[in-house]
Amino acid sequence: MKKDTMSHPPKQPHQLLSRMRNWMHRHPHRTYAIAGAGVIVIALIIVAVIYVANPQKTIDIPPIKITKRPPAPVIHYSPLTGVKVADEAATKQAVTAIMIENSPDARPQSGIKQAGVVYEAIAEGGITRFLALYQEAKPGLIGPVRSVRMYYVDWAAPYNASIAHIGGSAAALAEVRNGNYRDIDQFFNSGSYWRARDRYAPHNVYTNFERLDALNRSKGYVESKFTGFARTDDKPHEVPNATSINMTISGALYNTHYDYDKASNSYLRSIGGAPSDDREEGRITPKVVIAMKVDMTHVMEDGWRESITTSGAGSAVIFQNGIANEVTWRKNSRNDPLQFIDGNGKEVPLNRGQTWITAIPNSHGGVSWQ
């Protein structure tokens, strides 16, 4: 017996919507996920349609060339004078200190204008003498060469310098011959010195750097390691306060005077009332002049000798750029460098070029300027 099959009428649209709403209420998270996915699909379809309708143009970008800047040139300075030198090797050249006579019979001297640093002090009987130091400059003639004293050895020691001289006081010779110095005494190296015929002894011993450099090389003295003065570029002061300088050292033949020349920013040196000249190169014109007050006494060695206290501290005046600057000199020990210290305890930088330092006795010397 057949059962009658009843046909169900199709669901109406409002019933489907009702069921969908019920399902969404029961599954809210799935609803959001489906909606989000739908939005993304629609967005991708829109982008694809736009891209097909408006294809992007390809832009050719030329390659970027990167040009490396060349490194800034390295500037090398002489540790002795602060002036520019050719290369690093030049900054390490051996320093040579030469004792040069300053009695009237020795004037005008040779090679003194090219010295980097000069120390001037009384050697005996009020007669002054120079310790002239050279590094990058190589004069073809230097002299007259004379004997050394203990305080010149003290000043030369920090420069790791060869010391050129003809004998010396007992204390000085004992010091320079103790094995701690580069002693190139004429007594033991006569081939590096000669006597000139146009002057009489003892004011006629000369040398040059062709011979001294060969002598230094033969002994292995090819480099000098030392700390020089702090240096700076020179700049004339707009209102100079020291254009005329007088230094009283001993007698009239040895007292010195300097006139400031603003055009060259240097000092024209005079001694004994006359221009102080280099026989081959003319007027001596240091860039920096320093008056250094020192204690000086007489001591018995191989006879009575002058003795100057070189270690410790004392007053000094630096003349550069037309200005006088009162400072303190300081040297902690024989092998420590000489420094000039301002009121704030800082080292005063000196102008590049020749520096002339005069040791003035506290007991009877002096310096004045205007």
Language model regions located:
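Hydrophobic membrane-insertion alpha-helices, especially the h-region
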Residues: 35-48
